Amino acid sequence: MKQLDVNEYMALVGRQARTASRGMARAGTAQKNRALLHIAAAVRRDAAKLKEINARDVERARANGQDAAFIDRLTLTDRAIDTMAAGLEQIAALPDPIGEISNMKFRPTGIQVGQMRVPLGVIGIIYESRPNVTVDAAALCIKSGNATILRGGSEAIESNGALAALIEEGLADAGLPANAVQVVATTDRAAVGKLITMTEYVDVIVPRGGKSLIARLIEEARVPMIKHLDGICHVYIDADADIEKAVRVCDNAKTQRYAPCNTMETLLVSRDVAARALPPLARIYQDKGVELRVCPGTRATLEAAGFGNLKDAVEADWHTEYLAPILSIRTVDGLDAAIEHINTYGSAHTDSIITENYSTGMRFLREVDSASVMINASTRFADGFEYGLGAEIGISNDKLHARGPVGLEGLTSLKYVVFGHGEIRT
């Protein structure tokens, strides 16, 4: 498409989504669930066809020199397809938040005032190489009564198109608007630029991708976003920590998986327990191939315990989300220093304290300014499924609207509703 064509095309998509959003807001729970279950059945029915189409995307990606990790994210295996279908069924089983009325209060004037949960309207979702996001995102938007515009990575264009056809089939079967879910049918990057500025049609943008994508959108978007830029997550081992518990949690927080945004990137250890906590952890990390970047105090403790192969941490390390087997470690004087470090260098994503002291733990919860703050638990729990949300569209470390894992309720808003019996204001 030419530049003008892309702008016109995206404006058409936006108008169609806005119209569809009104129909979605009226849709009942049974109708939305019927669409989700039909899509799940269609995904399973067409599994072989989906893999065949996806193989063409994978072949092109290999020819373009994409690495093994990228190919893994792009590939639709039998397991990935079954997971997509199961996810649709799980979302269908979740309670429908739309139309709930809460916080009802009787006012002295005789009126009743409450809040009703309603859809946001039109949600633009921008993501990269994972075709499963097409289905996951569409499902959450359908269940929450929103229309959505999905712009996936160009590498998955055929896979996304095939999944879009199945979603359209499910919408039709349930009698929902055909344009409630639209997958952008061009790989032209200008489509993203248009999508993130269409304030007249799009209510919110949810980006799912790497740091460079998010940084670009922060600079260029006019539509509000639900997003996080970095996941610089910390665990602090307090002076009153159970060391065995600390070792177990910190091992999991770093080494269960290296790439997720809720993986620990910096370990903070109270000077009072450094000699007991650091050696067993360093042994685990080095056995698993984790590079340790340490402050002078941590180096002294570990070298005294016979450890080598340590790198000196520099200022940039405290700001870095590695997404790799690399860990920064700092020995601190206590809780005040730990909180100060986290609030200075963290990304307001997820941070945890290991302590047996109730007052210390509660102070950490109050004073650490992050979307998820934990006591005696791995940062890897910062996830919509683990929080009981059923599914998530992403994680936000912003403070407005949604914060932390964003599930169905994060894709809704509250409006005030008033019940009266003819009351007038005097």
Swiss-Prot record:
PANTHER family, per database record: DELTA-1-PYRROLINE-5-CARBOXYLATE SYNTHASE, GLUTAMATE SEMIALDEHYDE DEHYDROGENASE
NCBIfam families: PRK00197.1, proA
Organism: Ralstonia pickettii (strain 12J)
Function: Catalyzes the NADPH-dependent reduction of L-glutamate 5-phosphate into L-glutamate 5-semialdehyde and phosphate. The product spontaneously undergoes cyclization to form 1-pyrroline-5-carboxylate.
Protein name stated in the entry: Gamma-glutamyl phosphate reductase
Pfam families listed in its UniProt record: Aldedh (PF00171)
EC main group: oxidoreductase
UniProt xrefs under InterPro entries: Ald_DH/histidinol_DH, Ald_DH_C, Ald_DH_N, Aldehyde_DH_dom, G-glutamylP_reductase_CS, Glu-5-SA_DH, GPR_dom
Compartment list: Cytoplasm
Assigned protein family: Belongs to the gamma-glutamyl phosphate reductase family.
Gene: proA
GO molecular function, one term: glutamate-5-semialdehyde dehydrogenase activity
GO biological process: L-proline biosynthetic process
